[in-house]
Amino acid sequence: MAKGFTQQSSVDFVDTYSPVAKFASNRIIMSVVATMDLELHQLDVETTFLNGELKEDIFMLQPKGFEIKGLEDEVYKLKSSLYGLKQSFRQWYLKFHWAILEIGFEMNPLDHCVYIWRCYDELKILSLYVDDILLAGNSLDMMIKTKSFLASRFEMKEMGPATCVRI
C-alpha cells in the first residue's frame, strides 16, 4: 500500500475522483430491471488499482517485509497506480471508462458511473461502484459478451446473478 497521505496536490497528483454511481441512479436501475424483467448480474474487478496508468512519476520505499537484501534503502518508481495513492481511483476509472466506450456503451451524462448500450430491441445498463459492477440486460448472450470483454481487459470475478443488492 502506498502512503498517499504524504502526497502533495499539484506535485504528486493533479486529479482525484472516486467512481461511485449515485444512489438515485442505482434505484432507477433497479426499477427498470424490475419493470422490464431484465437479468441482473454482479461482477467484481480484482486488483483494481493496478489497472490505472500513472501520469506522474511516483517513487516508493520498499514495503516492510519485502525488502531486497543489500538494497534496503533503494526506492522504486511505480509503473502503475497502487492502492493508497490519491489518484488511483481516478486512474482506474479512466481505464475502465475508455474500455467500456470501446464496445459501444454510452456514459450517462447525469451520472458518469452509469453506462447504457442499446441496439434495436437489446438493452444493457452498467453501474460502476469503484470495483463493483452491476450489469443489467434483456439479452443474456449480449451480457455474456460484455462480461467476456471485461474479463479480457481486467481480472474479473464473476458473481453471477445478483440476489441481494444493497442500495
Can you describe what each PLM-predicted range is?
Residues 1-167:
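Long, low-complexity, charge-biased intrinsically disordered regions
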